[in-house]
């Protein structure tokens, strides 16, 4: 246990109304499109988005030349641009309020692996990440919800230890190669 006890807070917020058909349909569509395992993954992103939008809304109430608005507003915008959520052409607090859940889900490692063509489907991308076949830079990442920064996006590739990345072949392939080699040796012995 750490020396200083920490207050653990929830990473998601459940919807106020549990059976709202429009919301349920929208969540199901998002879960299918981005290959999410459960609604908690959507709610977690929704909480992050709501915190950022709340901060932006609070800053927009201040005067435009207010030092707090300038400093904190630039920090929020810079962070969102670095993550690739906000475009560089839209670097204003008004655009932060227009962000959607999809903008955050697009930056997940699972989505990026699928979009780069390393996986056949969004679900295959999730499996590849879990099985430690994907690296970002030199680091193997096995968390599908890892948020990929804009500068790290070009460094997504197969891990060097993975059979997909030129590493040791998988168990089935090794077995097949061994049987082919033994079969080839058996034929040579018969010819002599």
Curated annotation (Swiss-Prot):
Pfam families, per database record: Ribosomal_S4, S4
Keyword set includes Ribosomal protein: yes
Region annotated Disordered, chain positions: 166-192
rRNA-binding keyword on record: yes
Domain of life: Eukaryota
Residues bearing the modification Phosphoserine: 89, 179
Keyword vocabulary terms for this entry: Cytoplasm, Phosphoprotein, Ribonucleoprotein, Ribosomal protein, RNA-binding, rRNA-binding
GO CC annotation, single: cytosol
Domain S4 RNA-binding: 107-181
Molecular function, one GO term: structural constituent of ribosome
GO process annotations (BP): cytoplasmic translation; ribosomal small subunit biogenesis
Subcellular location, record wording: Cytoplasm
Oligomer and partners: Component of the small ribosomal subunit (SSU). Mature yeast ribosomes consist of a small (40S) and a large (60S) subunit. The 40S small subunit contains 1 molecule of ribosomal RNA (18S rRNA) and at least 33 different proteins. The large 60S subunit contains 3 rRNA molecules (25S, 5.8S and 5S rRNA) and at least 46 different proteins. Interacts with snoRNA U3. uS11 interacts with MPP10. Component of the ribosomal small subunit (SSU) processome composed of at least 40 protein subunits and snoRNA U3.
Function: Component of the ribosome, a large ribonucleoprotein complex responsible for the synthesis of proteins in the cell. The small ribosomal subunit (SSU) binds messenger RNAs (mRNAs) and translates the encoded message by selecting cognate aminoacyl-transfer RNA (tRNA) molecules. The large subunit (LSU) contains the ribosomal catalytic site termed the peptidyl transferase center (PTC), which catalyzes the formation of peptide bonds, thereby polymerizing the amino acids delivered by tRNAs into a polypeptide chain.
Anything else known: There are 2 genes for uS4 in S.pombe.
Family the entry assigns: Belongs to the universal ribosomal protein uS4 family.
Protein's name in the database: Small ribosomal subunit protein uS4B
Gene assigned in the entry: rps902
């Amino acid at each position: 246990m750490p020396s200083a006890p920490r207050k653990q807070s929830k990473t998601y917020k459940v919807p106020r109304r549990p059976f709202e058909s429009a919301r349920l349909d929208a969540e199901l569509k998002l879960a299918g499109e981005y290959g999410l395992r459960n609604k908690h993954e959507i709610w977690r992103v929704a909480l992050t988005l709501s915190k950022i939008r709340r901060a932006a809304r609070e800053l927009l109430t201040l005067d435009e030349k207010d030092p707090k608005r300038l400093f904190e507003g630039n920090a929020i915008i810079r962070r969102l641009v670095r993550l690739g959520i906000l475009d560089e052409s839209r670097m204003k607090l008004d655009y932060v309020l227009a962000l959607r859940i999809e903008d955050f889900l697009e930056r997940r490692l699972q989505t990026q692996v699928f979009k780069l063509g390393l996986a056949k489907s969004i679900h295959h991308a999730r499996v590849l990440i879990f099985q430690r076949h994907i690296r970002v830079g030199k680091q193997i990442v096995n968390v599908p919800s890892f948020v990929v920064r804009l500068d790290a996006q070009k460094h997504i590739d197969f891990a060097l230890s993975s059979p997909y990345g030129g590493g040791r072949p998988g168990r089935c392939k090794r077995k097949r190669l061994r049987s082919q080699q033994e079969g080839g040796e058996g034929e040579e012995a018969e010819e002599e």
